[in-house]
Amino acid sequence: MGKVLALAIALLGAVSAEVLAQEPADESRWRVGAAFGYGIRSNPLVQSDDIPIIVDLDIAWFGDHFFFDNGDVGLTFADNETLTASLVGRFNSDRVFFGRTETRFVNIDLAGAPLAEATLFEVPDRDYAIELGIELLADGAWGQLQMTVFHDVSNTHDGYELYADYGYGWRSQRWYFEPSIGASYKSASLNNYYWGVRDDEVNDVLPSYQADSGLNAHARLMLSYQLSRQWSFSLVIEYERLNDEAAASPLVEDQDVFGYFTGFGFRFR
């Protein structure tokens, strides 16, 4: 799931969690919802725009073993009261920032030094990678834990990512509150593909750069109020700190990435 989508989908999750707890066991295999509101995810790249979020959809289908969940497809091979393990295919989310960049004439390089003449500069493009991996989900009275390991199978970056996230939710009548924290380890190949600068991309503005592996950290806070069986009003705030190797890239202007989304969530089924 893309990082931008995750903010709105987290809001919809508050609707689903409350409603699912009230529904019988023969509920529909489909989960369909929509979020209406306003949010922004900051873009850490130089010469880029923040990413707006206004309307988003939550579409998922869960079979006995196979599932589709907002772009992720998977096969669940273990499922019990405390642990679910699945084989999952997805698109890497690091590329999303590169879709909101601009081309401009600049008079200084990225280090702030003046150029002899105005130069046309654009942030190099990057491709989406198709990744395959294992996802483990565990929950209990102690909270919820998600752990994943994904590897590129599309020969895009040929790297891998290790991810872990822990959250604990409180519910009081119509209110639901859930903070979560986590980290993701990016291999050198993955980090360098998205944040490195290759020799054929070097120019008067952009110097060469090779990124090594690194560890991102993130935190999220979700607050929701259940208006009815299908409607809720929620606020989601998210923070991510890029690893030092990514932050040192000449493509990156800000190591800290902030996001928020507030609005109404509606669950169709």
Residues covered by each model-derived region:
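Cleavable N-terminal export/targeting peptides
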Residues: 1-29
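Predominantly the C-terminal beta-signal and adjacent terminal strand-loop region
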Residues: 226-269
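Surface-exposed strand-loop-strand hairpins of Gram-negative outer-membrane beta-barrel proteins
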Residues: 42-55, 104-106, 110, 115-126, ...
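Outer-membrane pore/translocation modules
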Residues: 71-167, 171, 176, 188-211
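Short glycine/proline- and aromatic-enriched beta-strand/turn motifs that initiate or cap beta-hairpins
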Residues: 21-68, 73-74, 95
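Outer-envelope beta-barrel architecture signal
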Residues: 26-32, 53-55, 64-66, 81-85, ...
